[in-house]
Amino acid sequence: MRDAYLMMVLMDALKEIFDLKEILKSPIRNKKVILFVSLVFILSLVLLYILVVNIKYFSYLGDIIFQNFQKHVENLKITLNEDNLHIILAIWKNNLTVCILNYILGIFSLFVIAVNSYILSYVLYKFGAESFIYLVLPHGIIEIPALILSASGGVLFNMGLVNFLINIKFGTKREVLYYIKESLKLLILSIILFIVAGIVEGTITFKIAKIMFS
């Protein structure tokens, strides 16, 4: 009887997690966590841009981080002569890796958020607003929310684990299950957005890059 009950609970949970309406409502229910992660991203972006512009050390550190980022992009083996499908698949692989990593890291995904803010602030400083608008914004307006959602999902997952392991104030089984379900809904939504962002980056952004660098 207990096994049958657990199976029924699991099936109900999976049905809820993959319900599109529930997935779309999840950001509203978890807006406080998402706003917190968004605030970390925005403050990091603004603060790091100010530091990169005004302090040489941060500009130098930005050089190192950006060079490592370029090496990572080169490892994807994307060139201006590649077909769109190859580019999109390579971007998807990279984006989904970041998405899952963000989720697994939990609260430590805020460090990933800060590093991405550093890269964006450095690109804006190094290449100027025009290049930033053309080469980052087309896919960035989708990719950045996806990054924030995956990090938010990771934070929620951590909250569930803390409740489970330490059994603090709201550490009931129902509360733990709620956190895990909500975190997975945000993860699924972030994956969807990362897929869309990859298509935009592999088509629109890529075409803009070809025009600018040809």
UniProtKB/Swiss-Prot annotation:
Entry keywords, A to Z: Cell membrane, Membrane, Transmembrane, Transmembrane helix
Cysteines joined through disulfide linkages: none
Topology in membrane: Multi-pass membrane protein
Signal peptide start-end: none
Main location: membrane
Compartment list: Cell membrane
A Pfam match: SpoIIM
One GO term describing the cellular component: plasma membrane
Bilayer-spanning residue ranges: 33-53, 104-124, 132-152, 153-173, 186-206
PANTHER family: SLR1478 PROTEIN (PTHR35337:SF1)
Designated name of the protein: Uncharacterized protein MJ0706
Organism: Methanocaldococcus jannaschii (strain ATCC 43067 / DSM 2661 / JAL-1 / JCM 10045 / NBRC 100440) (Methanococcus jannaschii)
